[in-house]
């Protein structure tokens, strides 16, 4: 569910802009977190509580809007404009031509490399601890308490959403991660939701690396090597998402 919410809203809009599937999936989480940040700032002003029933429908509507824009964009590119020119709608919309065997093999190899990178990144976390175990470090404890504060206070704004952690003072603190995780956590499942978010961020990391390299070079070997190497790096994801779990920085 986290990955769907992270990817789907931005993916649709990026595909409407003509980006490849890989780039759209890699960049989509930034779109989603940007939208969440805007909502988290606007909701207190509008006196709207931050909870799944108020935030997730907006993400869903964004995805639907993007899907509509993508459909119109594809229709326009396929028909040299929006005119049907006497062609039936079903025929005008058409079906994309199947990709060839070579292209299919390249895509399969690329996504296979991404899967390998994700497994390498996630293995220490999955093998080393149960999902219900809290990370025994000061930073993840702070952030998990931040999610708890949002569940109780219904305020995810970076301008005071974590006030309970600062003696009631409304200080600025980037709350994108806390706001997102609070949409999938209950009062008794903050630890589990936080740990699952680590896996989601690992997936975002390896896909994002492959997407970044794909726009920097046409080398297939470099594109496939990027997520595998990225999955084994010590600073990220090993340190940031397994050892110290500095989620907002990740």
Annotate each PLM feature.
Residues 100-125:
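Internal/C-terminal transmembrane anchor helices
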Residues 23, 27, 110-112, 208:
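Core alpha-helical transmembrane segments of integral membrane proteins
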Residues 1-106:
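Membrane-embedded, hydrophobic transmembrane alpha-helices
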Residues 31-35, 58-62, 112-118, 140-141, ...:
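Mid-membrane cores of alpha-helical transmembrane segments in multi-pass membrane proteins
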Residues 116-250:
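Active-site lumenal/periplasmic loops and adjacent helix-entry segments of GT-C-fold
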């Amino acid at each position: 569910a986290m990955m769907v919410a992270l990817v789907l809203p931005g993916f649709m809009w990026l595909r409407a802009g003509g980006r490849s599937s890989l780039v759209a999936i890699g960049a989509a989480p930034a779109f989603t977190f940007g939208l969440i940040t805007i909502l988290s700032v606007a909701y207190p002003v509008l006196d709207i509580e931050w909870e799944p029933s108020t935030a997730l429908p907006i993400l869903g509507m964004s995805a639907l809007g993007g899907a509509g824009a993508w459909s119109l964009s594809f229709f326009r590119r396929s028909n040299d404009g929006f005119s049907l020119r006497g062609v039936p709608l079903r025929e005008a919309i058409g079906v994309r031509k199947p990709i060839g065997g070579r292209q299919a093999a390249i895509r399969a190899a690329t996504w296979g490399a991404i899967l390998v990178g994700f497994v390498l990144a996630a293995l220490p976390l999955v093998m080393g601890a149960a999902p219900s175990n809290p990370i025994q470090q000061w930073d993840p404890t702070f952030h998990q308490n931040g999610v708890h504060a949002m569940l109780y206070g219904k305020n995810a704004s970076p301008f005071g959403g974590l006030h309970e952690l600062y003696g009631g003072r409304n200080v600025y603190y980037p709350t994108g991660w806390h706001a997102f995780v609070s949409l999938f956590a209950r009062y008794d499942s903050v630890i589990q939701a936080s740990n699952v978010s680590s896996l989601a961020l690992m997936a975002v990391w390896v896909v994002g690396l492959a997407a970044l390299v794909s726009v920097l070079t046409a080398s297939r070997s470099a594109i496939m090597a990027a997520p595998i190497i990225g999955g084994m790096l010590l600073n990220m994801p090993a340190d940031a998402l397994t050892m110290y779990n500095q989620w907002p920085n990740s």
